Amino acid sequence: MRIYLIGLVAKILGIIIPLLLGVAFLVLAERKVMASMQRRKGPNVVGILGLLQPLADGLKLMIKEPILPSSANIFIFLMAPVLTFTLALCAWAVIPFDYGMVFSDLNIGVLYLFAISSLGVYGIITAGWASNSKYAFLGALRSAAQMVSYEVSIGLLLISVILCAGSCNFSEIVLAQTRIWFVFPLFPVFLMFFISCLAETNRAPFDLPEAEAELVAGYNVEYSSMGFALFFLGEYANMILMSSLCTLLFLGGWLPILDIPIFQVIPGSIWFSIKVLFFLFVYIWVRAAFPRYRYDQLMRLGWKVFLPLSLAWVVFVSGVLVAFEWLP
């Protein structure tokens, strides 16, 4: 029993510690890449080439005074960022980094991840409501509407992938892409899924809940110190999670780019990391290149474009698989 508990704790720490380090350096990478795209230098003072900037930012947030609004519901106000960050961590339980390298290899891994991601809206909307601020509440309402709208499309797009793979288990979905990655036969599904992931994680050009010009900072406007830091960590952890999800569903997870001996020597976890880093770069590139959508444009895209198209793709994929007897 003791050995089992030690192994369990080691597995949990093996996910949490690299994830927190990844989030810290993702923030630095984002600032560096955006600075390069905008012909600036970016952080370059703290440490060599600014590599210690995440540590300095973390220490700054830790030693700041947590300010609690006098009219806020204190308990819910404090629990909302904890809920957001906890859900962001729980989702990683079913993500395989290599064959067999997964915390819990569930047969319903896709459904588990979809359920956890849909719960993330509660942390945001309770934060906006408990703050008792009109800016925070409007930001939370926008975020809730945005996340719920695009979750419907994400769910239907996931069905197309599940039909092709014949399983809800992430490891089996990756192994189903041994001959060809799903990004090629399902390219429109991949595009819609990635754009929906941008909206689901409240990233540019869909970062309407945090629209600085009109809502100051959105749902976390009243947060400071570690409350703000937990929301920040949760957002970037979800970015890495969605990049991992795109990698598993469409780019073959840990499978090498080409099935040749020299590529098979490289560990699968390295291939997985390279693909995730590619998607993270695209996240940053989109933020630097595209302007923010209006709220009505965002809702129209979700309900009038992506929802009918994703439903049509489910019908089309089902028809093709049945007609050619390709059902797994």
Swiss-Prot record:
Lipid bilayer topology? Multi-pass membrane protein
Q: Which InterPro entries would you find in this protein's record?
A: NADH_UbQ_OxRdtase_su1/FPO, NADH_UbQ_OxRdtase_su1_CS
User: So what EC number does this one have?
Assistant: 7.1.1.2
Q: Keywords in UniProt for this one?
A: Electron transport, Membrane, Mitochondrion, Mitochondrion inner membrane, NAD, Respiratory chain, Translocase, Transmembrane, Transmembrane helix, Transport, Ubiquinone
UniProt KW Transit peptide keyword: no
Gene Ontology molecular function = NADH dehydrogenase (ubiquinone) activity
Tell me a GO cellular component: mitochondrial inner membrane
User: What is catalyzed by this enzyme?
Assistant: a ubiquinone + NADH + 5 H(+)(in) = a ubiquinol + NAD(+) + 4 H(+)(out)
Residue stretches spanning the membrane: 8-28, 74-94, 108-128, 154-174, 180-200, 213-233, 240-260, 265-285, 305-325
Say which enzyme class the record assigns: translocase
NCBIfam families reported for this sequence: PRK06076.1-2, PRK06076.1-6
| Function as written in the Swiss-Prot or TrEMBL entry | Core subunit of the mitochondrial membrane respiratory chain NADH dehydrogenase (Complex I) that is believed to belong to the minimal assembly required for catalysis. Complex I functions in the transfer of electrons from NADH to the respiratory chain. The immediate electron acceptor for the enzyme is believed to be ubiquinone.
Q: Which family does it belong to?
A: Belongs to the complex I subunit 1 family.
Q: What is this protein called?
A: NADH-ubiquinone oxidoreductase chain 1
In its UniProt entry, the species of origin is given as Marchantia polymorpha
